[in-house]
Swiss-Prot record:
Similarity field: Belongs to the GatC family.
Its job: Allows the formation of correctly charged Asn-tRNA(Asn) or Gln-tRNA(Gln) through the transamidation of misacylated Asp-tRNA(Asn) or Glu-tRNA(Gln) in organisms which lack either or both of asparaginyl-tRNA or glutaminyl-tRNA synthetases. The reaction takes place in the presence of glutamine and ATP through an activated phospho-Asp-tRNA(Asn) or phospho-Glu-tRNA(Gln).
Name by which UniProt lists this protein: Aspartyl/glutamyl-tRNA(Asn/Gln) amidotransferase subunit C
EC number: 6.3.5.-
One term of GO molecular function: asparaginyl-tRNA synthase (glutamine-hydrolyzing) activity
Subunit structure: Heterotrimer of A, B and C subunits.
Length: 95
């Protein structure tokens, strides 16, 4: 897969990043290099290799599952632009 100039500009627009005409070429090269590396990773045979979550072996830290006092609803919605009865108010998005 190859990224062209139009795709670079579209990605920049979607990411809300201002990209000058001088920056499009280098970005195109970087994106193509990243995609080539990802394609190369797809060819690696990983049959029989166990999945890993970390490069160093470690156990997940667990805490005791206890019921705690809530009562923080007012703190949770404190920075929301609009609330009602400790619920977030959002614009209607489906008719």
């Amino acid at each position: 897969m190859s990224v062209d100039e139009k795709t670079v500009r579209r990605i920049a627009h979607l990411a809300r990043i201002a990209v000058t005409d001088d920056e499009v070429g280098p970005l195109q090269g970087e994106l193509n290099a990243i995609l080539a590396f990802v394609e190369q990773l797809g060819t690696v045979d990983v049959a029989g290799v166990e999945p890993m979550t970390s490069v160093t072996p470690m156990a997940m830290k667990k805490r005791e599952d206890v019921v705690t006092e809530g009562g923080r609803a007012a703190d949770v919605v404190a920075n929301a632009p609009e609330t009602e009865d400790n619920y977030f108010l959002v614009p209607k998005v489906v008719e």
